[in-house]
C-alpha cells in the first residue's frame, strides 16, 4: 500500500494536470523513448476472434489443444449461474479439463479486488486462464494471469504512471481465453485493464499488448440474459468506442515516433484499418441497438450488438478513445449513492458505459469544428440525413443524434440524475487532467475551462 506522503505527492501531480494518462500510458520515461521524427506508422493487432451462437461449447477443445492441465476460470457468481455459461463448463467436463473457479470478481474492479484475484492465482500453479463474464471479469483475469507469472512483483509495479511504476511486461504469461457475456467493453480484444484506485479515488490501469487474450470466444447466446439496462449501458460503451476512435486525431498527428517500435502506444490515433471497424460498428448500432435493448429474446439484434462490441474493440484497441472516456473516469470514480437497475446493490456504481455516454452530446458538439466531415459521416452512419447539412452544424447534428439514442433508450438525464451537482465540477475536472494521454487524442485541444464547460453542459442532457 502507498504511504500518506506518496498519496499526497500523487495528488499534487494529478492536480497539476501535467502527467500522462494513468489508465493507458505505458512508460514512465517520457521523452527518453521518443525520437525527433513525427509518427509515420501505425500497428494493427488483436486477439484471435471466433464468433457464433453456441461457440462456447468449443472451450473444452480449445483448452485440450493448449494441453491445459490446471485451468483458472475467472467469473462472477451471477454469471456462473447462467444456462449459456453452463454450456462452457459442460465442455470442460466432457473434455476432461481440470479447473478451479474464482468467482469473487467485483463489478467495476478496484485495486483491492484485483489484488485479491492476483493472490488467488499465485497460490495455485495454473497453466492457463479463462475469463467468462463482462469486462470486469476479463480485466480481473488479465491481472490474475500477470501476477501469477511474476510472483515477486508488487501490485503497483505494473500500474501505469504516475500512480504506479509502469514496469514493462517481460515475463511470459499463460494462455488466456476470454468468453465475453456482455456486448460492451471489447476487453476480449485489448491489452488494457481499467480499475478504480481507491486511495486516490481515481481510475488507472495496466496496459501491455502481452495482456491481450490469446482467443476470444464471442457467443451471442450469452447476451440473451442481459437485463434491459445492462444491455443499454454496455451498448453505449460500444457506441462511444466507435465514435471516439473514428473522430480521434489521425495517427500521424499523435506526436513523435518511438525510438523502439515495441514502445508504440496501444492507442495510436485514427487510422484506415480502425476506421473500417468503427464504420462497421456504427452501422450495426443503427440497425440493432434499440431492438437489442428492449427485446431480450431478439437473438439477431443481440448477436449483432455482440459482434459490434468486438469489432469496435479491435478498432479502438488500436486507434484509441478520447474525451468521452477521459471525462468518464472521474464520474465513475466519484460515485455517491447511485445504484442502477439490473446491477447488484451491494455497493454504489456508475456503470462504465453510462459514465462514458453522459458527456457524449457535449463532447461531440465541442470537437466537431476540428473535423466536421468525420462528425457528419458518423451522424449519417447512425441514421441522420446529412445530405444538405452545413459543415458548421456538424457538432449540433451529431450531438442531437447521440441525445436521441439516449432518450429512446431511457438513459438517465445527465450528471444531475447520477447525484452530481455543479459544486462537483472542479473535482471532476481535476480527475480528468491525469487522463491527458487519452484526452489529447481528441481532435480539439482543451483547457481546464473547456473541461468544466463540458461537465456543466452535461448536468442535464434532455
UniProtKB/Swiss-Prot annotation:
**Family in the record:** Belongs to the iron-containing alcohol dehydrogenase family. Hydroxyacid-oxoacid transhydrogenase subfamily.
Q: What is this protein called?
A: Probable hydroxyacid-oxoacid transhydrogenase, mitochondrial
Q: Cite the Gene3D superfamilies for this sequence.
A: 3.40.50.1970, Dehydroquinate synthase-like - alpha domain
InterPro entries, per the entry: ADH_Fe/GldA, ADH_Fe_C, Alcohol_dehydrogenase_Fe, HOT
Annotated keywords: Mitochondrion, Oxidoreductase, Transit peptide
Is Cell membrane tagged as a keyword? no
Q: State the function annotated in the UniProt record.
A: Catalyzes the cofactor-independent reversible oxidation of gamma-hydroxybutyrate (GHB) to succinic semialdehyde (SSA) coupled to reduction of 2-ketoglutarate (2-KG) to D-2-hydroxyglutarate (D-2-HG). L-3-hydroxybutyrate (L-3-OHB) is also a substrate for HOT when using 2-KG as hydrogen acceptor, resulting in the formation of D-2-HG.
Cellular component terms (Gene Ontology): mitochondrion
**Biological process GO annotation list?**
glutamate catabolic process via 2-hydroxyglutarate
EC main class here is oxidoreductase
Amino acid at each position: 500500500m502507498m504511504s500518506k506522503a506518496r498519496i499526497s505527492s500523487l495528488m499534487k501531480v494529478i492536480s497539476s494536470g501535467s502527467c500522462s494518462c494513468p489508465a493507458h500510458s505505458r512508460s514512465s520515461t517520457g521523452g527518453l523513448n521518443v525520437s525527433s521524427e513525427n509518427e509515420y506508422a501505425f500497428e494493427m493487432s488483436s486477439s484471435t476472434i471466433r464468433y457464433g451462437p453456441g461457440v462456447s461449447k468449443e472451450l473444452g477443445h480449445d483448452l485440450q489443444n493448449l494441453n491445459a492441465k490446471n485451468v483458472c476460470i475467472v467469473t462472477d457468481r451471477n454469471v456462473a449461474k447462467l444456462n449459456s455459461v453452463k454450456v462452457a463448463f459442460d465442455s470442460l467436463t466432457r473434455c476432461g479439463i481440470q479447473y478451479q473457479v474464482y468467482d469473487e470478481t467485483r463489478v467495476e474492479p478496484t485495486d483491492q479486488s484485483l489484488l485479491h484475484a492476483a493472490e488467488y492465482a499465485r497460490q495455485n500453479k495454473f497453466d492457463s486462464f479463462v475469463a467468462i463474464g463482462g469486462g470486469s471479469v476479463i480485466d480481473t483475469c488479465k491481472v490474475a494471469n500477470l501476477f501469477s507469472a511474476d510472483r515477486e512483483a508488487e501490485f503497483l509495479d505494473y500500474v501505469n504512471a504516475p500512480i504506479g511504476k509502469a514496469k514493462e511486461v517481460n515475463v511470459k504469461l499463460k494462455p488466456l481465453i476470454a468468453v465475453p457475456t456482455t456486448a460492451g467493453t471489447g476487453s476480449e480484444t485489448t491489452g488494457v485493464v481499467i480499475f478504480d484506485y481507491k486511495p486516490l479515488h481515481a481510475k488507472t490501469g495496466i496496459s501491455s499488448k502481452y495482456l491481450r487474450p490469446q482467443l476470444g470466444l464471442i457467443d451471442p447466446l450469452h447476451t440473451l440474459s442481459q437485463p434491459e439496462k445492462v444491455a443499454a449501458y454496455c451498448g453505449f460503451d460500444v457506441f462511444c468506442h466507435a465514435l471516439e476512435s473514428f473522430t480521434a486525431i489521425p495517427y500521424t498527428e499523435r506526436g513523435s515516433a518511438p525510438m523502439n517500435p515495441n514502445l508504440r502506444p496501444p492507442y495510436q490515433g485514427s487510422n484506415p484499418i480502425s476506421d473500417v471497424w468503427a464504420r462497421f460498428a456504427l452501422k450495426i448500432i443503427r440497425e440493432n441497438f434499440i431492438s437489442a435493448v428492449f427485446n431480450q429474446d431478439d437473438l439477431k439484434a443481440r448477436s449483432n450488438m455482440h459482434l459490434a462490441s468486438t469489432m469496435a474493440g479491435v478498432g479502438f484497441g488500436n486507434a484509441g478513445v478520447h474525451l468521452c472516456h477521459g471525462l468518464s473516469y472521474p464520474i465513475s470514480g466519484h460515485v455517491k449513492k447511485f445504484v442502477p437497475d439490473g446491477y447488484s446493490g451491494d455497493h454504489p456504481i456508475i456503470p462504465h458505459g453510462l459514465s462514458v455516454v453522459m458527456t457524449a452530446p457535449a463532447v461531440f458538439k465541442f470537437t466537431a469544428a476540428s473535423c466536421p466531415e468525420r462528425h457528419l459521416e458518423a451522424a449519417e452512419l447512425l441514421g441522420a440525413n446529412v445530405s444538405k447539412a452545413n459543415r458548421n452544424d456538424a457538432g449540433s447534428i451529431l450531438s442531437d443524434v447521440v441525445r436521441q439514442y439516449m432518450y429512446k433508450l431511457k438513459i438517465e438525464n445527465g450528471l444531475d440524475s447520477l447525484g452530481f451537482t455543479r459544486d462537483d465540477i472542479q473535482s471532476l475536472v481535476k480527475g480528468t487532467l491525469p487522463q491527458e494521454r487519452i484526452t489529447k487524442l481528441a481532435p480539439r485541444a482543451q483547457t481546464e475551462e473547456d473541461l468544466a464547460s463540458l461537465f456543466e453542459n452535461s448536468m442535464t442532457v434532455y
